[in-house]
């Protein structure tokens, strides 16, 4: 059963739906749509959608995110334990699975779904006013969802989550994909949506980050909890190298 929550201010509304992971028949239907097995924990009914004057503008949806997972042979991570992942997906009584080429780490460039006809993001130099947000006081509203998560046959983690909060005059959303492939690399994509609720404009800040696994391990302090830090997405984000950064304004 899904739980719904929303917050409205002037012309803006943010809607959230959150539920449990997909059931087996739902996973099979999604696999048929995608052409590859979905992540172990796929929250297919979860979403966050932002509306302006009662019309959807931009949102984050599980199926849309997974549709952007690479499906070409060059997208497949060729590492020693890729076959271990494939074997982990065999059901009792099945033969070795036939899996079409796809990025089994579920890396996706998904930055949200534009829901409004004729709306488009235009690249600009303007930045999100971080200090104004920090000075705006405590949260008036907060919610978070997970779109999907997979432990990659105990060889790391792939997780896509979305968090949104409202402070006085501002709405801030962070959608984050973290793909950690142990002993190989760590990749992270962050999409921030910022809305000035008083002046009615929307910015999108997109960043891609990455580093080798060894580089991250070397930054763990002596005596630090390795497992906890590798699962701390904020800690990882601060230590990865930014390889791409673009900011857009939504025209609609």
UniProtKB/Swiss-Prot annotation:
A GO cellular component entry from the record: nucleus
Alphabetized UniProt keyword annotations: Cytoplasm, Nucleus, Signal transduction inhibitor
Subcellular localization(s) per the UniProt record: Cytoplasm; Nucleus
Family from the record: Belongs to the TIP41 family.
Disulfide bonds, paired cysteine numbers: none
General function of this protein: Involved in negative regulation of the TOR signaling pathway in response to type of available nitrogen source. Activates the PP2A phosphatase ppa2.
Gene Ontology BP annotations: negative regulation of TORC1 signaling; TOR signaling
Protein name in the entry: Type 2A phosphatase activator tip41
Top-level taxon: Eukaryota
One Pfam family recorded for the sequence: TIP41
Encoding gene, per UniProt annotation: tip41
GO molecular function: protein phosphatase activator activity
């Amino acid at each position: 059963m899904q739980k719904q929550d929303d917050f409205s201010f002037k012309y803006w509304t943010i809607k959230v739906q959150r539920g449990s992971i997909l059931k087996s028949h739902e996973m099979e239907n999604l696999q048929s749509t995608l052409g590859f097995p979905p992540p172990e924990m796929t929250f297919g009914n979860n979403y966050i959608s932002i509306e302006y004057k009662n019309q959807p503008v931009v949102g984050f949806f599980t199926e849309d995110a997974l549709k952007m997972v690479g499906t070409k042979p060059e997208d497949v991570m060729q590492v020693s334990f890729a076959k271990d992942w494939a074997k982990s997906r065999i059901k009792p009584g099945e033969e070795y699975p036939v899996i079409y080429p796809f990025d089994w780490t579920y890396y996706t460039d998904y930055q949200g779904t534009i829901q409004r006809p004729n709306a488009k993001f235009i690249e600009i130099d303007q930045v999100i006013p971080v200090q104004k947000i920090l000075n705006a006081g405590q949260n008036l509203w907060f919610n978070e969802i997970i779109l999907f998560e997979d432990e990659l046959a105990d060889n790391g983690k792939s997780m896509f989550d979305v968090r949104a909060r409202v402070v006085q005059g501002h709405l801030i959303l962070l959608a984050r994909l973290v793909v950690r492939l142990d002993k190989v690399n760590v990749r992270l994509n962050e999409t921030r949506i910022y809305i000035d609720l008083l002046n009615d404009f929307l910015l999108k800040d997109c960043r891609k980050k990455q580093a080798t696994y060894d580089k991250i391990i070397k930054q763990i302090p002596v005596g630090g909890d390795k497992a906890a830090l590798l699962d701390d997405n904020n800690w990882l984000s601060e230590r990865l190298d930014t390889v791409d950064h673009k900011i857009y304004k939504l025209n609609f």
